Amino acid sequence: VYDTNGDRCKEIADKYNTKAFRSVTEAINSADAVSVVVPTGFHFDTAMKCISAGKDLFLEKPITKTVDEAEKLIKEADKKNIILQIGHVERFNSVILTLEPYITNPRFIEVDRLGPYSLRNLDIGVVRDLMIHDIDILLHLVKSEVKQIHAVGFCVFSKTEDIANARIVFENGCVANVNASRVSVKKLRKIRIFQHDSYISI
């Protein structure tokens, strides 16, 4: 375990009977693979250190703060034959895994991922914090290239968007309407899928 807070690092290491490292370089060099769970602004530099050290890594989402950084990271990982897995864990949620066999020919999908305001992850907007999970699920379920995207977002309490809506049109004709908010009164997770022969709501 490595953390910039030495006391917290030792506390976690003691709790799980593992070693507390004094530097990120020492931790990376001692590992077979690395799980990078740091604020988004540090993803690129930390992941690059892992790749340079030849370590496979699991990187919390979003991959980086910018598309340019993401492309550089992917290119470097490919060049060094490093496994770079991004933490889009919702795709492996048991509900999504159960749903998957029933998705045959989706025509319209409505997705809501709403949550109350929190001081967590304010360095990125709601699209890369919450909606990114639903975009990943949609791409996985629809299995078609994206043709068109119309999106809008608004800042309410943060410097980045707190509310966002995206309408995604796929090449196969499926349309998805995706809503994300981190300024809602209560938490809501809902997916509604309309197909020619069925309606699924979870």
Where are the regions a protein language model picked out?
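Beta-loop-alpha module in the N-terminal Rossmann-like domain of NAD(P)-dependent dehydrogenases
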Residues: 16-74
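Mid-domain beta-loop-alpha active-site segment that forms a flexible
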Residues: 87-94, 115-146
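Short loop/edge segments at beta-strand edges and connector loops
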Residues: 22, 38, 59, 86-88, ...
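A short helix->loop->beta-strand "cap" motif at the edges of active sites that frequently abuts
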Residues: 18, 53-55, 80-83, 174
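A contiguous active-site-proximal alpha/beta segment in oxidoreductase catalytic domains
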Residues: 64-121
